Amino acid sequence: MAILKWKRSRWYSSDEISFAGIVTKLPTANNTTTSNSKTCALGTSEGVRRATTSTKRPRTEPEHRNTHHPNKLLRGDSVDSVNCGVISAAACTNQTRAVSCPATTPIIHLKGDANILKCLRYRLSKYKQLYEQVSSTWHWTCTDGKHKNAIVTLTYISTSQRDDFLNTVKIPNTVSVSTGYMTI
């Protein structure tokens, strides 16, 4: 029964069905033949069986509509987004960049052979007071096969802590050091 109700609700798009009546002779003043055509609402006493239609809620528009693709929603801000734009290290002349965007932290990327970086990360446990966090060894994806360098990222509370780290810890010559800022 539920399937029948569902099928009927799909067939009818509104609460009215329009149909042509039977041509009959109606007693009129001129005694002419007329066509009895009328619209009968569902569920009235006109002899039409009531078809149960499901009550449909009006479709609400989503908050973010994509103007280029109307069937797709716009994504909101990404998880790591902030109000600061991305500035490459080469084009950046702002020395107070960490202050300009409060959700950034000073970092160092150590790049080199994966095994050397793993040993270095183990040795860094002696200097825990000189950094905030250290990542595991990671790689960039979708790069050409020529560059097999692994990366370890270290975060710091301040640039002075990062400078103390660089002045204290001996970094192997085969490991390159890149300083910068990261959005946290």
Curated annotation (Swiss-Prot):
| Region annotation (Disordered) ranges | 33-74
Q: Where in the cell is it found?
A: Host nucleus
Q: Could you state one GO cellular component term attached to this entry?
A: host cell nucleus
Which keywords annotate this record? Host nucleus
Q: Which family does it belong to?
A: Belongs to the papillomaviridae E8^E2C protein family.
- What is this protein's function? Plays a role in limiting the replication of viral DNA in keratinocytes. Recruits the host NCoR/SMRT complex to viral replication foci to mediate repression of both viral replication and transcription.
The name this protein goes by in its record: Protein E8^E2C
According to its UniProt entry, this protein's organism is Human papillomavirus 31
Lineage of producing organism: Viruses, Monodnaviria, Shotokuvirae, Cossaviricota, Papovaviricetes
